[in-house]
């Protein structure tokens, strides 16, 4: 496998690689199964709210997807938050996730971020092992109150 990272959006959230956005949908839906039928429309709203996307590609095929944002707050300073990180199930344990994480870390460092943060579902033990191998630590609990 010959991996490369393709930046799908620019720093303003504009889609600069629409063909790669379209190719990302299948892999992205393997993590986010409730995404609406209008995938491009949903992602346009995410990008308008500060989200960015890159994909890991093997040739012309998307094998991993990352959606992230850079923001500043009072408790973590300037940080990168990873909304979504997913690897094609057929390509797990082949360096795809590591390639995306290394790219995200470079982007975060170049932007002056103090942290790279993400949340992972409590049931995703394999993902947790991966994040620990990537040098991440648990620093807080994440609480959610459903509103409807």
Labelled PLM ranges:
Residues 1-18:
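Conserved N-terminal entry element of GNAT/NAT acetyltransferase domains
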Residues 16-44:
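Conserved GNAT-fold acetyl-CoA-binding loop/helix
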Residues 44-55, 81, 137:
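A short helix-loop-beta-strand connector motif used in the catalytic cores of GNAT acetyltransferases and
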Residues 55, 61-70:
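Conserved beta-strand in the GNAT
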Residues 71-82, 92, 138-139:
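A conserved beta-turn-beta hairpin within the catalytic core of GNAT-like acetyltransferases
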Residues 87, 93-106, 133:
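Conserved acetyl-CoA-binding loop-helix of GNAT-fold acetyltransferases
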Residues 101, 108-120:
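Conserved GNAT acetyl-CoA-binding A-motif
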Residues 117-127, 144-148:
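Conserved beta-strand-loop-alpha-helix junction that forms the acyl-donor binding cleft
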